[in-house]
Regions:
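C-terminal accessory domains/tails appended to large, multi-domain proteins
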Residues: 221-384
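Short beta-alpha connecting loops at secondary-structure transitions
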Residues: 1-7, 25-36, 45, 114, ...
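Short, ordered loop/turn segments at secondary-structure junctions
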Residues: 10-15, 36-39
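Active-site loops and adjacent core secondary-structure elements that bind or stabilize anionic groups
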Residues: 39-269, 273, 294
C-alpha cells in the first residue's frame, strides 16, 4: 500500500457515487471507492489487494470519477435566493384553526426487550435486496427475469436466519420515546421541559431550502423548513414534538464473531443486513404506536404494512443526516434529551450511532408535514446558523 496509498471506502445511507467523485476523491491521493452496501466491501477489498487486478481497478475507478465530475459540472443548478426571500416563501399554515393533539405523557418512556416477532411484521424488504446489489421492488423482484433466481435464494436464506434469530433471541430490541412541548422561533424549534414552556431543553436549529422553487398552476412551491410544521411561539398555539431512538443492534457483534470464527462470512453479512432491516422496522412499529396510541393524533388509523412503507400516514419522522435534516450534530442533543444511554445507545466521534443497527429522529404530527431535500445553501444562511 506504500505505492497505492491507503484506500478509502465510502458508504452509508447519506453517501452516493456522485458525492464521492465530486466531494471526496479530488481531496485524497489514494484510491477512493464508493461501496453502496456492506456485502460488496469484501470484493472491493479483494480487488484493491490483488497484485493482478488492483492497478486496472483503481484506474477504471478514477476514469469513472472524472466522467462523473464532468457530468456534474455540466448540470445546470437551480439558482438560489436570499434567506430573507426563502423565509417569506415559507410553507404557510393556518395556525389559528389548528388545535394540536396533546401526547398521553410528557417526558420519556423506555421500552425494553421488544418482541422481535412483532417487529419482523413491519420489515420493508426492498432495501434488503439492495444490500446484495439486487435491484427491484419486493415482492416483484422474486419473479424478475434477470435477478429473480438469486433474489429468491437470498430471501429464503434470510427467512431461515430470521426465524433462528427470533427463536434464539440473538438480538435485543430496545426503544425510548419522548414527547415535549415545542414551538418555533424563526427556523428553530424549541423543546421545553414542561407545559410552562419557560425552560428550554434544547433548540433544534433547522435549515431552509434556498433553491428557487418552481411555479405550479400559477403558485410558487414553498421553500420548506421542518420548523414550518411546528406552531410559532407568537401564535399562542401549544404544540408538541416527539423524539425517539430504537436499536436492534445488541447481540449482533457477538453472533457475527461466532459466524466469522467458522469462516461463515455469508451468514455474518446476512445477520447484519437483517439487524438493519429490523431496526428500520422497529422505527416503523414505534411510529405506528405513536400515531395511534402514545400521541394518538391518528387514533383511527388503519393501514397495511405496504401503506406504511409508502408513508401514507399523517406526520413524518425526520432523522438527522437525511435530506430534510442534513446536520448530524443534532444527534448529540437528541440522544441527551431522551436518555439513549438507558438503551445502550451512544454516538461515535463521527456522529454514527452505536450499535450500528439503530435509528433515531423526531416525530412531527402536523397533517401538512412532509419530507423534502434542503439542498444547496447560500452564504447568508450558513452565517445565520
Amino acid at each position: 500500500f506504500r505505492e497505492r496509498q491507503i484506500p478509502l471506502m465510502i458508504g452509508g445511507a447519506t453517501t452516493s457515487r456522485v458525492h464521492t467523485a465530486v466531494k471526496i476523491a479530488p481531496h485524497y491521493d489514494g484510491p477512493v471507492v464508493y461501496v453502496p452496501d456492506a456485502s460488496r466491501s469484501v470484493s472491493v477489498a479483494s480487488s484493491l489487494l490483488s497484485d493482478e487486478s488492483a492497478k486496472k481497478f483503481i484506474q477504471d475507478l478514477r476514469d469513472d470519477y472524472v466522467r462523473i465530475r464532468e457530468q456534474h459540472a455540466n448540470k445546470k443548478a437551480a439558482p438560489t435566493i436570499s434567506l430573507e426571500a426563502a423565509r417569506k416563501n415559507r410553507e404557510m399554515i393556518d395556525w389559528a384553526s389548528y388545535v394540536p393533539e396533546k401526547p398521553k405523557f410528557i417526558g420519556r418512556r423506555v421500552f425494553k426487550n421488544f418482541a422481535l416477532s412483532d417487529i419482523a411484521k413491519y420489515i420493508d424488504w426492498t432495501p434488503f435486496f439492495q444490500t446484495w446489489d439486487l435491484a427491484g421492488k419486493f415482492p416483484a423482484i422474486l419473479d424478475d427475469e434477470v435477478v429473480g433466481v438469486e433474489a429468491r435464494k437470498v430471501f429464503a436464506d434470510a427467512q431461515a436466519l430470521l426465524d433462528k434469530l427470533i427463536k434464539g433471541q440473538w438480538l435485543q430490541a430496545d426503544a425510548v420515546v419522548a414527547f415535549y412541548p415545542a414551538n418555533t422561533v424563526g427556523d428553530d424549534i424549541v423543546l421545553y421541559s414542561d407545559e410552562t414552556r419557560e425552560h428550554p431543553l434544547f433548540v433544534w436549529h433547522n435549515l431552509r431550502q434556498q433553491s428557487e422553487r418552481p411555479v405550479v398552476d400559477g403558485v410558487r412551491r414553498p421553500n420548506r423548513c421542518l420548523a414550518d410544521y411546528v406552531a410559532p411561539k407568537d401564535s399562542g398555539v401549544a404544540d408538541y414534538l416527539g423524539c425517539f431512538a430504537v436499536t436492534t443492534g445488541h447481540g449482533v457483534e457477538k453472533k457475527v464473531a461466532e459466524f466469522q470464527a467458522k469462516h461463515d462470512d455469508y451468514s455474518a453479512i446476512m445477520l447484519k443486513a437483517l439487524a438493519d432491516r429490523l431496526a428500520e422496522a422497529f422505527a416503523e412499529l414505534m411510529h405506528h404506536r405513536v400515531r395511534t396510541d402514545l400521541w394518538g393524533y391518528a387514533s383511527d388509523e388503519i393501514l397495511t404494512n405496504d401503506q406504511m412503507i409508502n408513508e401514507e400516514y399523517r406526520g413524518i419522522r425526520p432523522a438527522p443526516g437525511y435530506p430534510a435534516c442534513p446536520a448530524h450534530e443534532v444527534k448529540e442533543d437528541l440522544l441527551r434529551v431522551i436518555g439513549s444511554e438507558d438503551i445502550g445507545m451512544t454516538l461515535t466521534e463521527s456522529m454514527a450511532m452505536n450499535p450500528a443497527s439503530s435509528v433515531s429522529g423526531f416525530y412531527l404530527a402536523h397533517p401538512d408535514a412532509r419530507y423534502f431535500n434542503v439542498g444547496k445553501l447560500s452564504d447568508d444562511q450558513v452565517e445565520d446558523l
